[in-house]
Curated annotation (Swiss-Prot):
Residues 134-147 have a biased composition (Basic and acidic residues). PROSITE patterns: RHOGAP, START. Residues 805-1013 form the START domain. GO terms for biological process: signal transduction. This is StAR-related lipid transfer protein 8.
Length: 1019
């Protein structure tokens, strides 16, 4: 037996298919009639003659390692093998392409060699037995016997099913691509027994090369029953060659690839790769090589003819057995292949960043990757045909496609394993979620009745090889504040993709409307809600009354400087971080969604008070990075309830909470959705985004049947915390204070009615969460022309117009010259006419109305940077990944002329809200007086479709001015006006200016701060 040098192979057989209840006897999978098991040595030994023993000739050793396992499996354990490499050789056996010393078919019986063949068999059998005895004595003398690993115990029915799949893996080892998907936490129990089948990677076969003979020891588990196929088989080399490079033995492309463990079913075992077979290319080069080696290897393959004939003879019997015993395996295999196709199709949407500076980036990354992983054969660039089963012809194309995309997916997954939400260096310029490949794969079988996906590809579900410690290693510039800047933004693309709107309803999503359209929808929603209340409320009761603000009373503004998570409203969070939910709360929701969906009674059972208090302290101390691994699901669920209960006002706001309750108290059930849509449109944008995230999260919780928490059960447990019911004045600072209860402490009729309305309302909103955040179609029809007129168009020229002007010899800089002159004129006048407003620390923030009368204001943010203007221009122009934490993808589409280019970038949003996509025309100048620089950009129509799950945002104006202000320092001024879609003008007035100030602060912090070290020297 000859295997790979220094190879350690462990085969685990798990059983998983269901059989009839009357099938109670154990399936016997014998190794071979040539083998016997010895209890004393715990090893297998050969009995009699064997056709497996061959001299280690140069041409034979390349093919003999796998047949020891492939040829002697029992007929009840092997599926059929078939190969159709070409139409001409459809009837020819696949193994007939193996180099043969003669021109006769490989499977035909040798003529005139029966007598000599028996002698050869007996001779090699005796020598092999003697060699095994010597190895056994040597092993006992050195005391180096290893204990076989214990495999997981499974039920009898699951064990028999996995035997079929594992044996199928034996026959298809090297031909079937490993599945790189990560199973969901809700399906972990059902998926544990599939690991043996999913653990076989695709091998890349090369021409057989002469290799030195190695000695190997076969380890059999201690609980192995003689006459049965062992559940765990380990084959290890006894005399490894330390100087031999791993590339000398024919490994698969993903062997030794430590960054990828997703294809392995068990993290504690390695699947064997039968890679000593000759390359399965067309027969011409193989036959030519066979003719060259015919004289040297004469007689080497003669003893294999009867073995191959035996293997080929198993096909019909195994095919009949598999069809009769396991008829239900075929649909499951087909479903798995369909999931694999979806994963491969959506894997191309993994986030990447590319710049003009980095040329040949893919080649450099491939070189660095191959050097980082030892044993990865970089010289193997060819692809081989795939061998598939006769029973599954429909999976040929997916497997061929998977084989072709394997190198790209290996590179993408390696980048995922080492990247988090933080920006990275300009050399690699790739920002990805740790699980984007699996996150984007949402199969139809994993969608619940409401269209919500339960497929999670989060860090907690990934294999150990893909997990990174918290906090993860950063890949950034390595200078300045980037060394200490925390990993703040969470990448949760699985949540985004699972709640992606359909093509029919995509245009009606609130987060895809322009600011002017949102303003019109507010007016229409107020009119509609007023009509509902006037129609269904009792005339003599004041049910639809909003209290007027008291102008003479001074409201003291709360100070949130000492608070980070609990008790801080969403508006403050979005001004601080750009997202209305704290990072730690998003991480808690992600932890529950990915790992705790099967916890019975989640959000109903109470957690431990001391542990919940400890989690609260962790959130306040480190709001950007909290690890919930190992925490109780009930503790984390109670933490979420406390967060919404401790908000200064309900998420529905104090003004609209009563309105929401009255909708479900007074209106008939058929009007609930229309009234709730109108009330939702009236919410502040940051509150509406938090509510949408919460409802989508709760719908995923309710979709998991294991936890027994339906939408109604969740509403009963969460309605008091979300609506702030039964809250006294001393317990909360919310202005919505409940009326006094009766003296006996029982809730009054009003309290009971509001509790019932809150429970019914929250249950309805969880069930119809997809429709709740859509614009009513009839409202759009009523608004008619005014709604269409509010839709903005890119201010810049169309790309076709630019190309025509360029062909006519017109300078493209003329299209941006107006913006350049406006910026220089404002700078010369010291930005006169701007109104200063409070902003973040160490920044100056100002605003003014737009000259075109648009409701969106223009915002200006300024700060000083410890770098000259040219360096700051390069940082803004080419190194956006170093200071923009939300950046997903960036690239220069086309360089139109020196100093003018077409630029495309995508920024992320809080899940499940869509990302923002920008296509801008930008121009820069570095020849200003005193060494100043500027950069101006604005959106244009790129004549290309909007990316899936993304929203095309509009950059109306973006101007950067870098002015020198001392030795090695510059003053950076950023003027911006943009429509990000899905936000009202009020949101831009309260939030957008702070986001601009945060942007210039991040650019400033990306440079190192020079500090004088030591005392000042007297001259």
């Amino acid at each position: 037996m000859t295997l790979n040098n220094c190879a350690s192979m462990k085969l685990e057989v798990h059983f998983q298919c269901k059989q009839d209840d009357d099938s109670e006897e154990e399936e016997q999978c014998t190794i071979s009639s040539h083998w016997a098991f010895e209890q004393e040595s715990k090893c297998g030994s050969l009995m009699g003659s064997s056709a497996l023993l061959a001299p280690p000739s140069p041409s034979l050793l390349g093919t003999s390692s796998c047949e020891s396992v492939l040829t002697e499996l029992s007929a009840a354990s092997l599926p059929a093998i078939s190969a159709s490499l070409s139409p001409e050789s459809a009837d020819q056996p696949l193994l007939g392409l193996v180099p043969s010393p003669s021109n006769q078919p490989f499977l035909s019986p040798p003529q005139g060699q029966e007598g000599s063949q028996d002698k050869v068999k007996k001779h090699y059998s005796r020598s092999f037995l003697k060699h095994l005895e010597s190895l056994r004595r040597k092993e006992k003398g050195d005391s180096r016997q290893t204990e076989p690993e214990q495999c997981l115990a499974t039920s009898e029915k699951a064990t028999k099913a996995s035997s079929f799949r594992t044996c199928r893996g034996f026959l298809s080892a090297g031909f079937h691509r490993a599945k790189n998907r990560v199973t969901t936490s809700a399906r972990v129990r059902d998926g544990e027994t599939q690991k043996a089948w999913e653990a076989w990677p695709v091998a890349t076969f090369r021409h057989p090369q002469p290799i030195r003979r190695r000695d190997y020891l076969v380890h059999v588990p201690g609980d192995h029953k003689p006459g049965t196929f062992p559940r765990s088989l380990s084959i290890e080399s006894l005399c490894p060659d330390e100087g031999r490079h791993l590339a000398d033995w024919q490994s698969s492309r993903c062997w030794g690839y430590e960054g990828r463990r997703g294809s392995c079913g068990s993290t504690g075992s390695h699947a064997s790769t039968y890679d000593n077979l000759p390359e399965l290319y067309p027969a011409e080069p193989i036959q030519a090589e066979a003719e060259a080696e015919a004289e040297e290897g004469e007689g080497s393959y003669a003893h294999l003819d009867d073995i191959l004939e035996h293997v080929w003879g198993l096909q019909q019997r195994v095919e009949l057995w598999s069809q009769t015993m396991y008829p239900d395996l075929r649909p499951g295999d087909k479903e798995e292949e369909e999931e694999e196709e979806e994963e491969e199709e959506e894997a191309t949407s993994s986030v990447e960043v590319a710049t003009v500076e980095v040329e040949g980036q893919d080649e450099d990354l491939a070189q660095a990757e191959s050097q980082a992983h030892r044993g990865f054969p970089t010289q193997v660039k060819e692809e081989v045909p795939l061998i598939v089963l006769d029973q599954a012809p429909n999976v040929v194309e997916p497997l061929v496609q998977a084989e072709a995309e394997a190198p790209a997916q290996a590179q993408d997954l390696e980048q995922e394993a080492n990247s988090t939400a933080e920006p990275i260096s300009a050399s690699s310029l790739s920002v990805e979620e740790g699980h984007s490949i699996s996150d984007t794969a949402v199969s139809s079988s994993e969608l619940d009745s409401s269209g919500n996906s339960m497929n999670e590809a989060d860090a907690a579900d990934a294999p150990a090889g893909l997990q990174a410690s918290v906090p993860r290693e950063r890949r950034d510039s390595g200078v300045g504040a980037s060394l200490t800047r925390p990993c703040r933004k969470l990448r949760w693309h699985s949540f985004q993709n699972s709640h992606r709107p359909s093509l029919n309803s995509e245009s009606l999503e609130i987060n895809r409307q322009f600011a002017g359209q949102i303003n019109l929808l507010h007016k229409g929603s107020l009119l509609r809600l007023t009509g509902f209340m006037e129609k269904y409320t009792v005339p003599h009761k004041q049910a639809w009354v909003w209290s007027m603000p008291k102008f003479m009373k001074r409201n003291k503004t709360p100070d949130y400087r000492g608070h980070h998570v609990f008790g801080v409203p969403p508006l403050i969070h979005v001004q601080r971080t750009g997202q209305p939910l704290p990072q730690s709360i998003q991480q808690a929701m992600r932890y529950l969604r990915s790992q705790c969906l099967d916890q019975v009674g989640i959000f109903r059972k109470s957690g431990v008070k001391s542990r919940i208090q400890s989690l609260r302290q962790m959130n306040e101390n480190s709001p950007d990075n909290v690890c919930y691994e190992g925490q109780s699901a009930y503790d984390v669920a109670d933490l979420l309830k406390q967060y919404f209960r401790d908000l200064p006002e309900p998420i529905f706001t104090s003004k609209l909470t009563t309105t929401f309750l009255q909708i479900y108290q007074l209106l008939p059930k058929e009007q609930w959705l229309a009234a709730a849509q109108a009330a939702t449109l009236l919410l502040p944008d940051e509150n509406r985004e938090v509510l949408q995230t919460l409802l989508y999260f709760l719908s995923d919780i309710a979709s998991a049947e294991e936890n027994q928490m339906t939408a109604g059960n969740l509403a009963v447990c969460l309605a008091p915390s979300i609506f702030h019911l039964n809250v006294s004045k001393k317990d909360s600072s919310s202005p919505r204070i409940k009326s006094k209860r009766s003296l006996v402490g029982r809730p009054g009729p009003r309290d009971l009615s509001e509790n019932m309305a809150a429970t019914q309302g929250l249950s309805h909103m969880i069930s119809d969460c997809k429709k709740l955040f859509q614009v009513p179609q009839d409202m759009v029809v009523q608004l008619c022309g005014s709604y269409s007129a509010a839709e903005l168009s890119p201010p810049g020229p169309a790309l076709a117009e630019l190309r025509q002007a360029q062909a006519a010899g017109v300078s493209l800089s003329l299209y941006m010259e107006e913006s350049v002159q406006e910026l220089l004129r404002d700078a010369a006048e010291r930005f006169k006419g701007w109104t200063n407003v409070p902003g973040p620390q160490h920044t100056e923030l100002a605003c003014r109305k737009a000259p075109d009368g648009h409701p969106l204001r223009m915002w200006k943010a300024s700060t000083e940077v410890a770098a000259p203007p040219a360096v700051v221009l390069h940082r803004v122009l080419r190194e956006r990944a170093l200071w923009d934490e939300d950046l997903l993808r960036a690239q220069v589409l086309e360089a139109l002329m020196p100093g003018v280019e077409l630029y495309h970038y995508v920024t992320d949003s809080m899940a499940p809200h869509p990302c923002r996509d920008f296509v801008v025309l930008r121009m820069w100048r570095s020849d200003l007086p005193r060494g100043g620089c500027l950069l101006v950009s604005q959106s244009l129509d790129p004549e290309q479709p909007v990316p899936e799950s993304g929203v095309r945002a509009l950059m109306l104006t973006s101007q950067y001015l870098m002015e020198p202000c001392g030795l090695g320092r510059s003053r950076l001024t950023h003027i911006c006006r943009a429509d990000l879609r899905g936000r009202s003008p009020d949101w831009y007035n309260k939030v957008f200016g702070h986001l601009c100030a945060m942007e210039v602060a991040k650019i400033r912090d990306s440079f190192p701060t020079l500090q004088a070290a030591g005392p000042e020297t007297k001259l």
